[in-house]
Amino acid sequence: MTRLVTATEMQQIDNYTIETIGMPQDVLIERAAMAVLDVIGAGRFDLSHVLVLAGLGNNGADGVAIARLLYAQGVNVSLQFVGNVSRAKDSVKRQLAIIEKHGLVRSEKSDFNEATLIIDAIFGVGLNNVLPEGLQKMIKAANHIDKPVIAVDVPTGIDATTGEVRGAALKAHTTVTFGFTKVGLTQQNGCYLSGNVILKDVGMLIPDDFEFSLQETLPVA
């Protein structure tokens, strides 16, 4: 069983696992990417053309790793960044350096109509503001086309703590969340927009004296 966590609690657990325990961040990214691939493989998804939408933070780094693993399996995958890559976190840049050696070329702009599956790796638990207007428009266009979406950790636009929509949210068919289920996936619009929530253990650790603000428990895959 695992507990529900707020965005702040999840970030504290991340920091403890990486900074105190010494688990390399790239190991967690790889495990998260492999967990998403497990879900893709277990589902009946059309992999004719997978579009990975990646942000500039750690969620985006997960997305780049997912794109790489799919590409290595021979899947037709397009990787599109949302935002200026020059401002991406180091975790994203490290993943980019790897895919460049693999030969996977980033797409400047992709047509949602051509995609048979969309991977949402734009924003995760770190979202704390209303989404930019341009991103809101893109999300609304994607929702209108109604393609199957797998969200990485949390659907973009959903507040991981409250479940509120921050301007617009990408509606997911499936959400693969890591370590602990975020409260926002069970509250308000977050419950509806997250689709089928699958919890995956990627090796995160918690301090012995860590106190959860909520007591609910859910099964872990």
From Swiss-Prot:
User: Tell me, what is one Gene Ontology molecular-function annotation carried by this entry?
Assistant: NAD(P)HX epimerase activity
Q: Name one Pfam family in it.
A: YjeF_N
Task: State if Transport is listed as a keyword.
Answer: no
Reaction catalysed by this enzyme: (6R)-NADHX = (6S)-NADHX; (6R)-NADPHX = (6S)-NADPHX
Keyword set, alphabetical order: Isomerase, Metal-binding, NAD, NADP, Nucleotide-binding, Potassium
Give start and end of each YjeF N-terminal domain.
Answer: 10-210
Q: Does the keyword Hydrolase apply?
A: no
Q: Where do the annotations place K(+) binding?
A: N59, D120, T156
Cellular component aspect of the GO annotation: P-body
Biological process (GO) annotations held by this record are: deadenylation-independent decapping of nuclear-transcribed mRNA; P-body assembly
Q: How is the cofactor bound?
A: Binds 1 potassium ion per subunit.
Question: So which cofactors does this thing need?
Answer: K(+)
Q: Binding of (6S)-NADPHX: at which residues?
A: N58, N59, G60, A61, D62, G124, V125, G126, L127, N128, N129, V130, D153
Q: What is its EC number?
A: 5.1.99.6
Question: Which family, according to the similarity comment?
Answer: Belongs to the NnrE/AIBP family.
Q: What does this protein do?
A: Catalyzes the epimerization of the S- and R-forms of NAD(P)HX, a damaged form of NAD(P)H that is a result of enzymatic or heat-dependent hydration. This is a prerequisite for the S-specific NAD(P)H-hydrate dehydratase to allow the repair of both epimers of NAD(P)HX.
Q: Protein name, please?
A: NAD(P)H-hydrate epimerase
Organism placement in taxonomy: Bacteria, Bacillati, Bacillota, Bacilli, Lactobacillales
